């Protein structure tokens, strides 16, 4: 068992990285930043200016905003200013009503919102919101993670500036323990169960999102389609088909704008879904014990957090690669696998899915989620037969942690030019 102080640091990390969110986290982070700038202004803004990193723009252009029936940033910004409360974090617009939605639509129609790409920055997650009214101005900036405010200014007075601290090399709030896969395994499998039972909240949130998808036609209805007779004829009424259905359904609801919270992982709701629902469904149908489920969910979520430590909050790689690697580990554990089997599953996932491009948050993410979950199951099955991709093949290293770093190096560094090209394609398409 890991030492108590190490366990406490990991638990603190999980509590910060596995949190509820309503809607896609990028537009919600923009709404959150808008809400804070509005609070600093102290009145309803007459004008709002947004300066955003390319990855924020990419992930917010085509996704449904919960409870609005609309997509994109203008309505998210409008609602952040009109009803948003920064204390709600990524549930910032949960007080939405039909009346305030109409106010938000009216605000958008008045062309009060200006959205631009922030030039000259390297940070992939950057949100700068400036609100103006009555000759007053207030600015809030979020950077690095979806709820991390680094700058606040009102009426020319700087109230918060973590950017200066970072530039001068002074200590910042980054206290995250640096993980490796063996540490993740040891924590998940040996920590006293009462210390990690909180992870069951992810099950409650994300399985509820899957049920919500059945109440409407969200996104491309990938999950609902998996439940229909034709799909049953092809895939059978099996654990495999149930896992795909429950995971894709939750993604359908979230990307389609359902007003339903999910438990996110590392700033992504879809990653939270992928790290949760496959493990929950497998544990139920495999008749695993409640304790085994808790440990499998912990292993899944913490594996995803570990990989994201190296990759960063946003990248050119589709996040389902990361989260489904986590769920593959969780399923492998539920199958009775040991640490070696977990390593095999991780290597199989990296060998299969590396290179899947993130082209923004949108309803079709449910298709990528289905591909990721399918690969997670296959990787787990192969690992339990001691079959795995070896160091003689591609980017896989004998050391599993080096294999993970190979994956993250590609996503964080090598694919930057591709990320720019993806955004250029997205912003220069003809009218839909």
What are these language model-derived features?
Residues 6-41, 45:
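N-terminal signal-anchor module of multipass membrane proteins
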Residues 2, 22-25, 55-56, 143-147, ...:
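A structural signal for small-residue-enriched, beta-sheet-centric alpha/beta enzyme cores
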Residues 20-36, 260-277, 319-322:
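Conserved phosphate/anionic-ligand binding catalytic regions in large, soluble enzymes, centered on
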Residues 1-11, 42-56, 238-257, 289-307, ...:
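Acidic-glycine-rich active-site phosphate/pyrophosphate-binding loop
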Residues 38, 282-295, 305-371, 384-394:
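Hydrophobic alpha-helical bundle architecture
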Residues 31-131:
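Early transmembrane hairpin of solute transport permeases
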Residues 44-48, 88-93, 114-117, 193-199, ...:
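Flexible, glycine/charged-enriched surface loops at secondary-structure junctions
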Residues 109-257, 424-432:
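Signature of multi-pass transmembrane helix bundles
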């Amino acid at each position: 068992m890991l030492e108590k102080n190490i366990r406490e640091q990991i638990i603190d990390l999980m509590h910060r990285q596995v949190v509820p969110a309503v809607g896609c986290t990028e537009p919600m982070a923009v709404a959150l930043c808008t809400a804070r700038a509005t609070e600093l202004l102290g009145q309803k803004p007459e004008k709002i200016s947004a300066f955003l990193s390319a990855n924020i723009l990419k992930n917010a252009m085509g996704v449904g905003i919960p409870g609005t029936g609309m997509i994109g940033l203008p309505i998210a910004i409008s609602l952040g200013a009109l009803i948003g409360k920064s204390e709600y974090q990524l549930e910032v617009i949960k007080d939405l009503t039909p009346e305030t939605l109409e106010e938000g639509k009216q605000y958008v129609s008045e062309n009060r919102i200006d959205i631009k790409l922030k030039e000259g920055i390297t940070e992939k997650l950057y949100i700068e919101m400036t609100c103006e009214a009555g000759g007053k101005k207030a600015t809030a900036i979020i950077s690095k993670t979806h709820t991390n405010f680094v700058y606040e200014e009102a009426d020319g007075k700087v109230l918060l500036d973590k950017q200066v601290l970072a530039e001068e090399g002074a200590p910042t709030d980054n206290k995250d323990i640096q993980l490796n896969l063996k540490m993740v395994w040891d924590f998940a499998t040996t920590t006293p169960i009462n210390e990690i039972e909180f992870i069951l909240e992810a099950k409650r949130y994300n399985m509820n999102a899957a049920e919500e998808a059945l109440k409407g036609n969200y996104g491309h209805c990938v999950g609902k389609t998996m439940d229909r007779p034709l799909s049953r004829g092809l895939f059978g009424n099996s654990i495999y088909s149930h896992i795909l259905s429950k995971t894709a359904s939750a993604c359908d609801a979230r990307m389609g704008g359902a007003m339903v919270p999910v438990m996110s992982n590392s700033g992504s709701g879809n990653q939270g879904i992928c790290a949760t629902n496959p493990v929950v469904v497998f544990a139920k149908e495999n008749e695993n014990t409640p304790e085994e489920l808790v440990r499998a969910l912990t292993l899944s979520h913490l594996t995803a957090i570990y990989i994201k430590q190296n990759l960063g909050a946003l990248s050119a790689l589709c996040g389902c690669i990361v989260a489904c690697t986590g769920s593959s580990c969780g399923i492998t554990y539920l199958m009775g696998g040991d640490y070696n089997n977990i390593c095999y599953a991780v290597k199989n996932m990296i060998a299969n899915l590396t290179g899947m491009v993130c082209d923004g948050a949108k309803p079709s993410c449910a298709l990528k989620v289905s591909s990721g979950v399918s690969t997670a199951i296959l990787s787990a099955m192969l690992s339990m037969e001691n079959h795995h991709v070896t160091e003689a093949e591609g980017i896989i290293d004998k050391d599993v942690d080096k294999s993970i770093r190979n994956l993250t190096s590609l996503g964080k560094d090598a694919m930057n030019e591709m990320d720019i090209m993806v955004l250029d394609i997205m912003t220069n398409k003809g009218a839909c």
